[in-house]
C-alpha cells in the first residue's frame, strides 16, 4: 500500500473515534439530566458550551477557518437553539432513549480502539496525512459538492413529510423561534463578514470568497427548512448517527496536526462533530507561514540581485578609472578571453596580469561605498565567484557591446590567409647558385622539429663562412631593389624566394641568433598579431644584416622602417574578404599572404644631389599663410615664422554687433569700416593693414588723410578676412605710358614680360577722385573675382549718390600682379596711378 492510502485509513479511523466520543458525551448528558425543564435546558446548553470552547481554541491556535466552517458553526448554534425550545415543550420519548443506548453500545468499542490508535500515531504519519489531504482536496471538491446537495435535499424532503402532521402543534412556539432565528442570522452575518475580511487579505482570498457565497446560500436554505420542521428534525439529528465524509476526515486530520495536547484535541473534535451535523465541504487550510516565507524569499532574492548588480557596476567603474595606466594590449587580450570564452594559449605575463586583475576586482567588490564598511553585504554575497560574474546581467550587457565592437574591428581589419614558408632559392631572381640554401626548408611539425631545425642552422653557419663574398653580393643586390620593403595581397614564387633568401642569410650570418620561430599552435587567430610577427621577423633580419655588414647601415634602416610601414598600410587597405585564418593540419610555419615583395619606385637610384639627410631644398610655399620662402635659409625661416603668426592673428574675424554690410555673396560678404567707427574696428583695420604691407613688401607709411579713408573687408564664410581694400580721396592722377610689346606667341611669355619689364607714366596730371592705396587678396583665394567685387562696391559707395567711372579711379604704385589686375579690370594698360605717399607729386 502506498503512503497516501495509509494516511487516508488513519485519518478515517481518527475521525470515527472523535465522532464516537462526541456521541458518548451527548448520551451521558441526556441520561444524567432529569425529565424536568431545568434539566433539559442544561442538556441543551452543553453543545453551546462546546461551541464556545471551540471558538476559544481557534483563537489560541491561530488557525484560519474557512467560511464553510463558520457557516457550520452558525448552523450549529441555530440547531442548538431549536433543540432548546423543543425540549422545553416535550420530553424525550422512550424510543429515542432506546436508540441512543444501542448507538452507545455499538460505538463504545470503536472509541477505545480509536483512542489507542490515535495515541500511537507518529508525527510523521500526521504530516503525511496533512500533505495528502491538501493534494487531494482540489480533486475531490467538485464531486463532493454534488453529493452533499443531493443528501441535503433528500433529508429535507423526509423531514418535511414527517413533520407536516405535527406542525399545527408548534404554532405557538414558532414566534419565539423566529425571533431567535433572526438574532442567530445577524450573529452569523457578523461572523461571516469577519471571516471574509481575514480570508480576502490572504493570497487565496478570491477563491475562498466564491466558496463562501456557496456556503451562505446553503446555510440560508437550511435555516428555512429548520423553521418549517422544528421538532422532528431535532429528534432525528439526535438519534441518527453523524454521517462520516472524506471532508470531515480531512478537517479533523488538519486540526489533529496543529493540536499538541489531548485536551485541545478533544475540544477541537467536539467542535467538528457538533458543527458537521449537515455535511459541508471545508476549504483547504492555507498556512500563514508559507506565504510569509515566500514573500521573504522573494524580497531577499530581489535585494541580492540588486546589490549584486550595483556592486558589479561599481567594480567596473572603479576598474576602468584605476587601470587606465595599463597597456592597451594587455587590456584587449584580457577582454577578448572573457566574452569569447575561448582558451587561447598566451604568455605567462598575460596570465599573471589577468589573475592580478581578477583578484583586484574581487577585493573591490567587497566595498561598494568607500566611506562605509559593508561587512553584512560581504557575508551575504561572499559566494560570488568569477563564474557568477560572467553569468550576471551587467557582464552580459558589457560583453554583448564589447563583442559587437570587436566584430566591427575584425570586419574592418584584415585576416589574411597564411601560406607555407619555404626557403627554396630561385636562381632566376638572384642569378647566383646557392646549393646549401636550396636544400633547406623551414618547416616545423608537431614532433620536435624545432631542435632539428636549429641543428641545421648551426651546420649552415660553418659552411657560410666560406662564401661571405657571395653573401655580400647577394645582400647588395637585394638592398638595391627596394621592392623588398613593399607588400601586396598575393604571393608569387620569385618574390617569396628572395624574401626567404634574405631571412636565411640573416639567420646564417648573425653570430647570435636572436629571433626564434614559433609553431602554429602558439600563433593566435588574430591577423594583426600575425602581421606584427612577420614584421618583427623582417626587422630582425635587417638588424642581423647590419651587424654583419655595417657599411650598408642607412639603407638597411630605411628598408626596415619601410617594411613596417608597408605592413601596417596593407593591414588597413586589404578588403575584408578573408575573414578567418586557415592553418594546416600538420602545424607548419605560415606567413600572411599579403606579404609580397614587388618592384618599387626607382627614385633612390636617380638621386643626383647629395642631400645629406635634408630633403627640403629650394623655395617652399606655406599652405596656411601662402608665403614663399627658402627652407634651408635661417633668415627666411624666421621671417616666415613672424609673418605666419601675424597672418593667423590678423585674418581671424570674430564678428561685430554693428557691421556695415555693402554686399553679400555665396562665398562671403563685404563690409566697410569708416574712421568714426568703434575702436575695436579701427584696431582690426590697422592690424590687417600692417599684415598687408608686409605681404606686399611696402614700407610702413601713414596715409595722406586718415579721416577721409574707407576700408573694405571681404569676410569669408569661415570667418576669415581674405580681402582688403583701402581707398582715399585724391585730386590728381597720372596715366601709364603703354609700350609696344614684341611678338609673343603664348600668354605665359606675355605675363612674364609684363612682370619683368620697366614701365613709366606721363608727367601730365589728370583729375581723379578715388585713389586705391592698397588692394590685397589672400593668395589661396585668388582667381575668384574677390578684388573686382570689392572695387565695384567701392565705386558705388565711395561718394553718396554717385557711381564712379573707371577713369576716376587711380592705383597707387602697383606691384607686377597689381598692374596685371588693373590692366584686366580697366580694359587697357593706360590706367591712372598716383604716389600713395603724396598724391600731389608725380612719380
UniProtKB/Swiss-Prot annotation:
Biased amino acid composition, Acidic residues: 18-28
Location, primary (coarse class): nucleus
Highest taxon, organism lineage: Eukaryota
Zinc-finger among keywords: yes
InterPro entries: AcTrfase_ESCO_Znf_dom, ESCO_Acetyltransf_dom
Maturation and modification: Phosphorylated during mitosis.
Any Pfam family: Acetyltransf_13
Compositionally biased tracts (Polar residues): 66-78, 269-278
Binding site for acetyl-CoA: 775-777, 783-788, 815-817
Zinc finger (CCHH-type) residue numbers: 620-644
Gene Ontology MF, one: zinc ion binding
Subcellular location per the Swiss-Prot or TrEMBL entry: Nucleus; Chromosome
Cross-link (Glycyl lysine isopeptide (Lys-Gly) (interchain with G-Cter in SUMO2)): 335
Biased composition (Basic and acidic residues): 566-584
Keywords: Acyltransferase, Cell cycle, Chromosome, Isopeptide bond, Metal-binding, Nucleus, Phosphoprotein, Transferase, Ubl conjugation, Zinc, Zinc-finger
Residues where Phosphoserine is found: 202, 415
GO cellular component, one term: chromatin
Catalyzed reactions: L-lysyl-[protein] + acetyl-CoA = N(6)-acetyl-L-lysyl-[protein] + CoA + H(+)
EC number of the protein: 2.3.1.-
Function: Acetyltransferase required for the establishment of sister chromatid cohesion. Couples the processes of cohesion and DNA replication to ensure that only sister chromatids become paired together. In contrast to the structural cohesins, the deposition and establishment factors are required only during S phase. Acts by mediating the acetylation of cohesin component SMC3.
PANTHER family xrefs: N-ACETYLTRANSFERASE ECO, N-ACETYLTRANSFERASE ESCO1
Family per record: Belongs to the acetyltransferase family. ECO subfamily.
Subunit composition and interactions: The subunit structure is controversial. Monomer. Homodimer.
Protein name in UniProt: N-acetyltransferase ESCO1
